[in-house]
From Swiss-Prot:
The keyword Coiled coil applies. GO terms for biological process: permeabilization of host organelle membrane involved in viral entry into host cell; virion attachment to host cell. Residues 483-515 form a coiled coil. Residues 509-775 are annotated as: Spike foot. A motif (DGE motif) lies at residues 307-309. The lineage of its organism: Viruses, Riboviria, Orthornavirae, Duplornaviricota, Resentoviricetes. HAMAP family: Rota_A_VP4, Rota_VP4. Keywords: Capsid protein, Coiled coil, Disulfide bond, Hemagglutinin, Host cell membrane, Host cytoplasm, Host cytoskeleton, Host endoplasmic reticulum, Host membrane, Host-virus interaction, Membrane, Outer capsid protein, Viral attachment to host cell, Viral penetration into host cytoplasm, Viral penetration via permeabilization of host membrane, Virion, Virus entry into host cell. This is Outer capsid protein VP4. A motif (YGL motif) lies at residues 447-449.
Length: 775
């Protein structure tokens, strides 16, 4: 039977070339190592004496916390928070545009009973009633929108950090209110924002609005420890306008030189453009189910001007630490569901590998010092329509994150033609508004960026910044140091697999049913599976080895290992013998599972839940107790074989992933049955269950305990023709008891006879199974 291919893979009995094993170990070590990026990134040293170098700061990157500044009066820039850090009580801030905004912030000490105090506000002496019953400091925001009315207490802020904030943005003036550590922002509207001027009576800081989350953090939890020492001296605000000697956009500085080598410092302003890649996979069936919505690495090539020079750059964007979610609208075939959709949020990272054609990247092999500064960028998600056949389409929309520079190290990008020594910039994430939701479902109000439409129609996102590094390079500028081997998050294998998946799914729809049955009956092994693939005769053994090594990490192989882990003799026979059937019968690997399910049934009373849990294990039980009938894995292997023979994208690198993926994703909607005399018990992975008689197809009560006992002691059969199809066939055409038994046992000869007779019910069932064989 064709499923022999999967059983052979599960034996893990294969030979390996020593050179292949060494290559694999080296690759796995590179891929699994955790890089802690710091101010230095080093590779192999070269024969020179290293000397110190300088790293020029860049004016293209705004500091998060700028200050402290001395008390002053000025016209505040839009989109910048003014963080007030008063020491003494009294008036700490005044601001007005002389038309519709007059705002003053007063600081009241702790434990003050209600009393009247005099304050001078905008040249007027005002008597204001204040009180503070708290052990924290209290800011009174006094506001009026007309020069002829009195000030009113608008938004008090009770604070143990003694920090307040003020911002002009979007036709509004913003302040903080509430009580720390849960203070929030609020605003007053103005029609004349550009004319707002402020008088500040205390030390203050300036924070860009793009870092509002940091400002919120300072207000609620206090300034960083370094800002609370007496070594930090406030300076005049005019110091912001001092003209600095700005470093050049491109700088090549010789630090030292010998006869053959020289140390070079390269300083570069860079523009990084990147985009997210994604993969949306739809399950087979009626068109209401999606398998995954996931992030994929994406590369982007572009040109930009840098100091009058045309630069060609290449970036690769990948993500790490994704969060997996799922949505299931119900168990019916017409209920919308997404088995897995990915989301990036605060615990995730984004990696961007950057390369350009400048001299800095020509000899990036021996690197001593590496530093960088980059601005932040906000990435907002767009809409994605799940196009179901009938009814209003569910729409995944919204979601946003901001990327903040968190480190830089060395990497290598693999393009279609060449490997590029690159810089990898790591970004931490903060979630932003809006939240995302799936319209017409109960999913709403979640934060993060989903993989459905992460680019939101934009060709790319853009970040400006600067890097500086010191390299050891040949004294002869025309010589290029050979590139050293390296492994990155993104490899071209993903692109090849994407092309292969599309081709595979297209070819699988062209399979003739009689061809499928014939292939399903063949005893396909490793080498007959590869026989139709061109140019693989010389590498058949290596390819088989690669497939087996990949397959042993698959979900199916892991499940078998878990079942046999506590049974040494059974595990030994599974991993070493040529056939999984041998010696399994003496110690049933199903025993532990049935006991676990029996225990679960005591706490979970839903028969549907129990049968669903049992059915997901029945595939493993079927593998260990083969029958003469055709099973789902026979169909999977047959569908796998046909497109492989016709594929133009198959290669030794992609084949292991395709075979492993097929074992996990093909025919997700499976049903299994056990047969006892004239009674059949059948259950599927969605929790549907039937018990019926062979002669009449009359349903009888379903007993879970009996089903478990039968599945433990009797062979498990794939319900290729499930109960509903059998009943439909009997009601419309009438079938004999012998035919019914053959179909229940999934006899391939009887299936072929019905297909040759063009029986529409049987053909439709087989077509639905083929449609579920998608990557």
């Amino acid at each position: 039977m064709a499923s022999l291919i999967y059983r052979q893979l599960l034996t893990n009995s294969y030979t390996v070339e020593l050179s292949d094993e060494i290559k694999t170990i080296g690759s796995e070590k590179s891929q699994n190592v955790t890089i802690n990026p710091g101010p230095f990134a080093q590779t192999t040293y070269a024969p020179v004496t290293w000397r110190h170098g300088e790293v020029n700061d860049s004016t293209t990157v705004e500091p998060v916390l700028d200050g402290p500044y001395q008390p002053t009066s000025f016209k505040p820039p839009n989109d910048y928070w003014i963080l007030l850090n008063p020491i003494n009580k009294g008036v700490v801030f005044k601001g007005t545009n002389r038309t519709d905004v007059w705002v003053a912030i007063l600081l009241i000490e702790q434990r003050v009973p209600s009393q009247d105090r005099q304050y001078t506000l905008f040249g007027e002496v005002k008597q204001i009633t204040v009180e503070n019953s708290s052990d924290k400091w209290k800011f009174f925001e006094m506001f009026r929108n007309n020069a002829n009315i009195d000030f009113q207490l608008q938004r008090p802020l009770t604070s143990d950090t003694k920090l307040a904030g003020f911002l002009t943005h979007g036709g509004r003036v913003w302040t903080f209110n509430g009580e720390t550590p849960h203070a929030t922002t609020d605003y007053s509207t103005t029609s004349n924002l550009p004319d707002v001027e402020v008088v500040i009576h205390t030390e203050f800081y300036i924070i860009p609005r793009s870092q509002e989350s940091k400002c919120n953090e300072y207000i609620n939890t206090g300034l960083p420890p370094m800002q609370n020492t007496r070594n930090v001296v406030p300076v005049a605000l005019s110091s912001r306008s001092i003209t600095y000697q700005r470093a050049q956009v491109n700088e090549d500085i010789i630090i030292s030189k010998t006869s053959l080598w020289k140390e070079m410092q390269y300083n570069r302003d860079i523009t990084i453009r990147f985009k997210f890649g994604n993969s949306i996979v739809k399950l087979g069936g009626l068109g209401y189910k999606w398998s995954e919505v996931s992030f994929k690495a994406a590369n982007y090539q572009y040109n930009y001007l840098r100091d009058g020079e045309q630069v060609t750059a290449h970036t690769t964007c990948s993500v790490n630490g994704v969060n997996n979610f799922s949505y299931n609208g119900g168990s019916l075939p017409t209920d919308f569901s997404v088995s897995r959709y990915e989301l990036i949020k605060e615990n995730s990272y984004v990696y961007i590998d950057y390369w350009d054609d400048s001299q800095a990247f020509k000899n990036m092999v021996y690197v001593r010092s590496l530093a960088a500064n980059l601005n932040s960028v906000k990435c907002s998600g767009g809409n994605y329509n799940f196009k179901i056949p009938v009814g209003a389409w569910p729409v995944m929309s919204g979601g946003a994150v901001s990327l903040h520079f968190a480190g830089v190290t060395l990497s290598t990008q693999f393009t279609n033609f060449v490997s590029l020594n690159s810089l990898r910039f790591r970004f931490s994430l903060t979630v932003e508004e809006p939240s995302f939701s799936i319209l017409r479902t109960r999913v709403s109000g979640l934060y993060g960026l989903p993989a459905a439409n992460p680019n939101n129609g934009n060709e790319y996102y853009e970040i400006a910044g600067r890097f500086s590094l010191i390299l050891l390079v040949p004294s002869n500028d025309d010589y290029q140091t050979p590139i050293m081997n390296s492994v990155t998050v993104r490899q071209d294998l993903e692109r090849q697999l994407g092309d292969l998946r599309e081709e595979f799914n297209s070819l699988s729809q062209e399979i003739a049913m009689t061809q499928l049955i014939d292939l399903a009956l063949l005893p396909l092994d490793m080498f007959s599976m590869f026989s139709g693939i061109k140019s693989t005769i010389d590498v058949a053994k290596s390819m088989a080895t690669n497939v087996m090594k990949k397959f042993k990490k698959s979900g199916l192989a892991t499940s078998i290992s878990e079942l046999t882990g506590s049974l040494p003799s059974a595990a030994s026979s599974v991993s070493r013998s040529s056939s999984i059937r041998s010696n399994i019968s003496s110690i049933s690997v199903w025993t532990d599972v049935s006991e676990q399910i029996a225990d679960a049934s005591n706490s979970v009373r839903s028969i549907s839940t129990q049968t669903s849990a049992i059915s997901k294990r029945l595939r493993l039980r079927e593998i260990t107790t083969q029958t003469e009938g055709m099973n789902f894995d026979d169909i999977s292997a047959a569908v796998l074989k046909t497109p492989l023979d016709k594929s133009t994208h198959i290669s030794p690198d992609t084949l292991p992933d395709i075979i492993t993926e097929s074992s996990e994703k093909f025919i997700p909607k499976r049903a299994y049955r056990v047969l006892k005399n004239d009674e059949v018990m059948e259950a599927d992975v969605d929790g549907k269950f039937f018990a019926y008689r062979v002669d009449t197809f009359e349903e009888v009560p379903f007993d879970v305990d009996k089903f478990v006992n039968l599945a433990t002691a009797s062979p498990v059969i794939s319900a290729i023709i499930d109960f509903k199809t059998l009943k439909n066939l009997n009601d419309n055409y009438g079938i004999t008891r012998s035919q019914a038994l053959d179909l229940i046992r999934s006899d391939p000869r009887v299936l072929r006879d019905f297909i040759n007779q063009n029986n529409p019910i049987i053909k439709n069932r087989i077509e639905q199974l083929i449609l579920q064989c998608r990557l």
